[in-house]
Amino acid sequence: CNKLAILNRGKIDQEYPLFLLYNKANIPGRPESIGVHTKNLSNRLINNQSKKKYNLVLKSLLKGCQLLKKSKCKFIVVPCNTAHYWYEDLKKKIRLPIINMPKEVFNHTLKKCKKNSSIGLLATEGTLKTGVYNKFFDKKYNLIYPNYILQNKSVNKAIKLVKMGDVKAANKIIKPA
């Protein structure tokens, strides 16, 4: 919230953006629910346990989206990249625009980088596992990823530091990646 207010400074209160924040910290683990819903299996879920995990996360995300819709929001932004694994199912069930963050990053990249360029993707292991960026980037760019050591020593630690609000320390740790 602070960052949103800082980036959209107003001279008076009425100039600040109106937004609603729904933060559900106890949502079931997204990374543990990934890999259970693949196109390779004709969109069939692998087994009942995997289906339950997938549906628990979907149900939790839907609850948040429905609450925002009831609050008369005009669109929804999901800041968790990994949660975009459930984007298509959310979109089908919520009659409200949901900003697709990986697609927006791709559109921005199209404006800034030549096609067929190598683009580094620094993300959580869950986001990498979902392939939510690959479906946009694979045909136009060469996505490159940190190796296992850099992922664990730099990227994962930097992401945790950002979540804790220590961006300065995260900037130092991410440099090797």
Which residues does each PLM region occupy?
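Non-catalytic structural scaffold of enzyme domains
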Residues: 1-177
